[in-house]
Amino acid sequence: MNYLNELKKLEILHVDNYQYIESKKLNKDEYLLHQGEKLNYIYILLRGKVKVNHINANGNSMLCSFNSPYSIIGDLEFITQSPIINNVIAYEDCICATISLSKYHEILMNDVFFMKAIAKNLASKLSKSTQNQSISLNYP
């Protein structure tokens, strides 16, 4: 998998932990994560774009974001060990790196490189969310 070299350059994981990565292909409109289910894998988007949406209690779908390559998917649920908060759907054909949480959760929790990548990813999401919210509030 030539994506491993790209991930290694980004230092998303400690060098010893790349051996746990597998790859997953998604076709356009295929679900990667379903809201309310248990998170079984952590994902790193390698190619393509995914759409993140949330179904409200009244049944309305709210678009949250689009994620591009090298974003980590499932980061919040990984940290909080909570059910999946949003649906994640392939907006186009995608390739993801996957790591099984049932096998490697503790290893990832103790990987300083991975936790740093998670922190950066969450900070980016918070920044985008804040910008989007301020635009919505200021829109006439």
Predicted regions and their residues:
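A generic structural signal for short hydrophobic patches within well-formed alpha-helices
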Residues: 104-105
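Cyclic nucleotide-binding regulatory domains
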Residues: 30-92
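Cyclic nucleotide-binding regulatory module and flanking cytosolic helices
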Residues: 1-28, 71-73, 77-79, 110
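Polybasic "coupling" helices that flank or enter modular domains
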Residues: 109, 113-140
